[in-house]
């Protein structure tokens, strides 16, 4: 798997909110991890690759338990969207500390002092200027996951690939490798195969959108050293999902 095969022009990195936390130190955001991500992305940008990010909010808010506590689903989802804005601002600060230029665009209408309202043309121009664009607020509508937001924004900005880091899992398997030691890992798999086998790498809406817009998906273990940088260059154990 050579250098040029994985030298994408524009990528979208999907980061989970939970992945930003440090549970051992009881930190919602591990700033050492943010610093590490920033250093990797600095090297990616030096290669001429344009970087956008969609970040989740699971380190601040888990909507799954909201309904049983009397919070309706749509309101719980909006709380989650606000959590992604907090993460986006934290990432921006960490990136700027490493000398990167970063913008936070929100799908929700917020005060411009907090985050810019998303306009596709502006975001695209930022990417062309080697600025990192962070998309926060999910899709701006309830009942959609941040995976769907990732494929939506990847489609809108014309990303070549979505780079999706998983915690402790280095690709797509036929079954949960943490529960089934005989699970088979795929080096390459098609979106149709993912759908037919009902593999839970993203929700169905996200998978269908990525397939329709011919966006490749790279799944890798984000806990490995320099994993983001190496995944983009094909230098790490991963799975590539294609049409």
Swiss-Prot record:
GO terms for cellular component: cytoplasm. GO terms for molecular function: ATP binding; UMP kinase activity. It comes from the Bacteria. ATP binds at residues 14-17, 58, 62, 167, 173, 176. Keywords: ATP-binding, Cytoplasm, Kinase, Nucleotide-binding, Pyrimidine biosynthesis, Transferase. Inhibited by UTP. InterPro entries: AceGlu_kinase-like_sf, Asp/Glu/Uridylate_kinase, Uridylate_kinase, Uridylate_kinase_bac. Pathway: Pyrimidine metabolism; CTP biosynthesis via de novo pathway; UDP from UMP (UMPK route): step 1/1. PANTHER family: URIDYLATE KINASE, URIDYLATE KINASE PUMPKIN, CHLOROPLASTIC. Homohexamer. Belongs to the UMP kinase family. Catalyzes the reversible phosphorylation of UMP to UDP. This is Uridylate kinase.
